[in-house]
Amino acid sequence: MTHLERSRHQQFPFHLVAPSPWPIVVSFALMSLALSLALTMHGYIGHMYLIYLSILTVTLSATLWFRDIIAEATYLGDHTIAVRKGINLGFLLFVVSEILIFAALFWAYFHSAMSPNIELGGVWPPVGIQAVQPTELPLLNTIILLSSGATITYSHHGLVGGNRKNALSGLLITFWLIVIFVTCQYIEYTNATFTITDGVYGSVFYAGTGLHFLHMVMLAAMLGINYWRLRNYHLTATHHVGYETTVLYCHILDIIWLFLYIVFYWWGV
């Protein structure tokens, strides 16, 4: 039922979502993933199988959920102006919640770093911790991430200006820059001399940078989806809500990373 046909039967512009199994399925999959990560930190036998199963379940259910949303937006015409305003507002509230989460992590870091107690040796980083050097992989990652912010802006201007080629090329370059960032971050983690179990420093460091790492993985998936939709002419110069939220998400993660780099890598060392 198109938007024109639906308007003959209802007197409001809002989309009444049909019953869907995906919210509850994704919720249980995310809960299983969080549980498996907790089991991993405590060294339970067979925890990796649960992690792989949870990641597979989250990926599959999220993909099917995205498929339904794309169908509602592109083929059924359910995303009216009022619905798009609601989506934008919901995403802004999501961004605010993410900022508050990272604010709590920065608070935890400063709480221990500015007044290290005797158990930490009275110094920061604590005695025995060899911190990651800010001029190595973290600096490269910072350059990559700032470059991705420039390329996604280039792509956005191309889409709004009707230049499809620039929009596609900028989006593709941004996607690969994010993939390179995630790869470099993984290499940094595997070569670090401390883990998340190494006291308050390891816990806060991996909680902050690791949470940002997970968000970058999500961003890569969002960029891939938007690239596919743009290639298939789902997005126009005036109707591209998912694309705009992805651009905003990319810039927010850039800003958060700058604070992480300055505080966790540079000031903290």
From Swiss-Prot:
Any Pfam family: COX3
InterPro entries: Cyt_c/ubiquinol_Oxase_su3, Cyt_c_oxase_su3_dom, Cyt_c_oxidase-like_su3, Cyt_c_oxidase_su3-like_sf, Cyt_c_oxidase_su3_a-hlx
Catalytic activity annotation: 4 Fe(II)-[cytochrome c] + O2 + 8 H(+)(in) = 4 Fe(III)-[cytochrome c] + 2 H2O + 4 H(+)(out)
Chief location category: mitochondrion
EC assignment: 7.1.1.9
One GO BP annotation of this record: mitochondrial electron transport, cytochrome c to oxygen
One Gene Ontology MF term: cytochrome-c oxidase activity
PANTHER family: CYTOCHROME C OXIDASE SUBUNIT 3, CYTOCHROME C OXIDASE SUBUNIT III
Protein family (similarity comment): Belongs to the cytochrome c oxidase subunit 3 family.
Complexes and interactors: Component of the cytochrome c oxidase (complex IV, CIV), a multisubunit enzyme composed of a catalytic core of 3 subunits and several supernumerary subunits. The complex exists as a monomer or a dimer and forms supercomplexes (SCs) in the inner mitochondrial membrane with ubiquinol-cytochrome c oxidoreductase (cytochrome b-c1 complex, complex III, CIII).
Name this polypeptide is given: Cytochrome c oxidase subunit 3
Organism of provenance: Kluyveromyces lactis (strain ATCC 8585 / CBS 2359 / DSM 70799 / NBRC 1267 / NRRL Y-1140 / WM37)
Gene designation per UniProt: COX3
